[in-house]
A protein has these predicted regions:
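Non-catalytic, usually N-terminal nucleic-acid engagement modules in DNA/RNA processing proteins
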Residues: 2-184, 292, 296-300
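Glycine-rich phosphate/ribose-binding loops and adjacent secondary-structure elements
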Residues: 176, 180, 188-306
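Conserved small/polar residues in nucleotide/adenosyl-binding loops
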Residues: 324-331
């Protein structure tokens, strides 16, 4: 079963073009995945996401879906695709990052992560096995292993201990995944995650360990928690020079246009980030000429389009129109 085909490699950088094959469609890479935390991308209708934005795949979050609507509802609905009426591929992250960033309190143990829901305080355990089972019920096309996402900065001793735990969790995740307890009749693919903080030897060790597993694709985690861009690029370069050429590489959570273009040149194929939708809701827009704050008063009589180079929606509304129709604190 072919999952990834490398179509072209740049002669000027490590950029490449390829295709990912899933039961729900082909994904052309490099690809940016809009984030739909609960399945749907905030502020965007599914038809617009498909027809205008032309999203080939979206990302949903295991932590949030586990808490609401819950796996029983998703199972009864026939999985996330039917629940949100989306017939293209979906990737789910493991939920580990959200446990560490959103939970009121959490404890990392060998067996997994104990945490309290940020919604109602209820207590739960995410183990490598339970996270695979949950994503199986969610029904995503690509699922992720549970890992520990380190803060930045982080000392070497803790990063080394954490990496050993993450690798142990990876092995357990693969064992559970290989049981093939599919909830639905289509293929699901598992990506391991390279961690190691910002330490070259740990990143190399993790990239080598992950590569040995020969999974369908590989992810690079822990580089969207506040690191300077030079550190991001350096670590991505280190990892991409080790990960196998014939598997897609997914850089988790990194999503400014500048970051994406630079990391494509380093050999990354897949990206996700909440930034486009979150920033858009708050008036910050990415254009082909840089980012603009549409709530700035200087746009109040600017009747030119947001960006005439970026398709229908960007050329349809003027800057002045968006300034006056954007939500403000008093609305």
């Amino acid at each position: 079963l072919m999952f990834f085909k490398l179509i072209h490699r740049s002669s000027k950088s490590n950029a490449r073009a390829g295709k990912i094959f899933t039961d729900r469609g082909v994904i052309r890479t490099p690809i940016f995945m809009p984030v739909g935390t609960l399945g749907t991308v905030k502020g965007v209708h599914q038809k617009e996401l498909n027809d205008n934005i032309k999203a080939q795949i979206i990302l949903s979050n295991t932590y949030h879906l586990f808490l609401r609507p819950g796996i029983d509802v998703l199972l009864d609905s026939g999985g996330i695709h039917k629940f949100i009426n989306w017939n293209k591929p979906i990737l789910t992250d493991s939920g580990g990052y959200q446990v560490f960033s959103l939970s009121n309190n959490f404890k990392i143990k060998q067996e997994g992560v104990y945490f309290s829901s940020h919604i109602d305080g209820s207590k739960h355990l995410f183990s490598p096995e339970s996270v695979i089972k949950t994503q199986n019920i969610i029904g995503s096309d690509i699922c992720m292993v549970l890992d520990e996402c380190l803060p930045y900065p982080c000392d070497y001793s803790y990063a080394k201990t954490s990496l050993n735990l993450t690798h142990n969790w990876l092995d357990r995740s693969i064992i559970e995944f290989n049981k093939k307890n599919k909830a639905y009749d289509y293929n699901q693919f598992l990506f391991p995650i390279v961690q190691g903080g910002t330490f070259k030897d740990l990143r190399e060790k993790s990239a080598e360990y992950v590569s040995e597993k020969q999974m369908a694709g590989n992810a690079i985690g822990g580089l969207s928690v506040g690191e300077p861009k030079e550190i991001i690029y350096n670590n991505v370069d280190i990892v991409c020079n080790i990960l196998p050429m014939d598997r897609p590489r997914y850089l988790m959570g990194v999503g400014t246009p500048e970051n994406i273009l630079e990391c494509i040149s380093l050999g990354v194929d897949m990206f996700d980030c909440v930034m486009p939708s979150r920033n858009g809701r708050n008036g910050m827009l990415f254009t082909s000429e840089g980012s603009i704050n549409i709530k700035n008063k200087k746009w109040e009589r600017d009747f030119s389009p947001i960006d005439s180079k970026l398709g229908y929606m960007s050329s349809y509304y003027s800057k002045a129109c968006l300034l006056y129709t954007s939500p403000s604190p008093r609305d």
